[in-house]
Amino acid sequence: MSNRRRFLIAATSSAASVLVGGVGATAATAPPPGREASLEHDMSAMPPSWMGADKIAMLLYPGFTALDLVGPQYFFANLMGASVQLVAKTRAPVTSDTGLSIVPTATLDECPADLDVLFVPGSGGGVLNAMEDLALVAFVADRGARAKWVTSVCTGSLLLARAGLLTGYRATGHWVARDVLGDFGAIPVDERVVRDRNRVTGAGVSAGLDLGLTMVAELRDRSYAEGVQLLAEYAPKPPFDAGTPATAPQAVVDMIGGMFPGFIARARRIARDTQSAKGG
């Protein structure tokens, strides 16, 4: 049996367990009483290397951007054997910047000290508030210092930078605020996904899908990632070619870019305060 065929058998079972078992489910998780997976598969042909025990923590904070989180979470949750935790200050639902509420599965204190992956989503004003929340910053700095992989999407890289995790690293983020990374000592890069050693950062919002697939390949292998991509039918063909400043009409770029002077000013102030606190 080919690797691709083995994967589709295994990944379909993994996806079913995620659907019936919740965010933190793994391929070995039993469905809740009275709810059984509709598909049963023979897993005996699965390559041993495709079953892991990854510990993944995805940070939640008020006002996060939902797609920043949900896109990568789909791919992380399809890593067979992985434990994917949604971590916040409390277990109370956390509301995104578009009003979608997500229930955390662990608090900051309950999150494992040693992680395979730390992930931080971005947002607008919410990430700035998070950057000024000393408890969140301390958590990100602590877990990120030991995590095997430190990752983010969109303006989430600003929070990583605020925690001192991107100093001297190449990194990306949402185009509106990418250059602010330099104020924290990072090296801004205009790419959709940037890997520098064990730091992997994604550009704005939808780049989380690409980051998620990138991490699946890193944590398993390319065939596994291709199988997850096929399972998700991820083959984007947007109706407009306006997804970057390089391709969007200049009037649109000017309009969107002109909405964020306050965001940029506050982010730069946080950077100055951070550097001053370090004596820099």
PLM regions with names:
Residues 197-204:
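A short glycine-threonine-serine/GTX helix/turn-capping micro-motif
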Residues 54, 190-197:
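Glycine/charged-rich beta-loop-alpha catalytic/anionic-binding loops adjacent to active sites
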Residues 166-193:
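A conserved active-site-flanking secondary-structure segment within enzyme catalytic domains
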Residues 68, 204-211:
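Catalytic-loop motifs flanking and including active-site residues across diverse enzymes
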Residues 150-151, 172, 189, 200:
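Structural detector of well-ordered beta-strand residues that form the stable sheet scaffold
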Residues 131-134, 172, 203:
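Residues at secondary-structure transition points
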Residues 2-150, 158-161, 178-179, 188, ...:
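Extended, subdomain-level signal for the structured scaffold at the beginning of enzyme domains
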